[in-house]
Every structure is written in C-alpha cells, then in structure tokens.
Amino acid sequence: MTRSLKKNPFVAKHLLRKIEKLNTKAEKQIIITWSRAITGERRELNPRW
C-alpha cells in the first residue's frame, strides 16, 4: 500500500538530524543508509523480527 499524498514523506528522526546538520553547514554529502522503521504491531505479529 502506498503512502497517502496528504501526508508528508516519512523520514527517520536520526536521518533527519543528519540532513539538518548538513543543511546548516551548506555542505553536500552522500548519506548511505539502510534505515527501515518497523512498527511494534508488526513485530508482535511476526516474532522473527
């Protein structure tokens, strides 16, 4: 299911901090991440997570 257009895109908090830090320095840098948010409900449904 896709995310609603009414909502803003999801960005993890720790990645948002990195982006804001780079924006204040006016630097351009590649941020490599494998970040994925997992909700508690999904974790309860599938104990392997």
From Swiss-Prot:
Disulfide partners: none
GO cellular component, one term: ribonucleoprotein complex
Presence of the UniProt keyword Ribonucleoprotein in the record: yes
Transmembrane segments: none
GO biological process, one term: translation
Keywords noted in UniProt: Chloroplast, Plastid, Ribonucleoprotein, Ribosomal protein, RNA-binding, rRNA-binding
Subcellular localization(s) per the UniProt record: Plastid, Chloroplast
Any one GO molecular function term: structural constituent of ribosome
Protein family membership: Belongs to the universal ribosomal protein uS19 family.
Role according to the record: Protein S19 forms a complex with S13 that binds strongly to the 16S ribosomal RNA.
Protein name: Small ribosomal subunit protein uS19c
Originating organism: Sinapis alba (White mustard)
Gene behind this protein: rps19
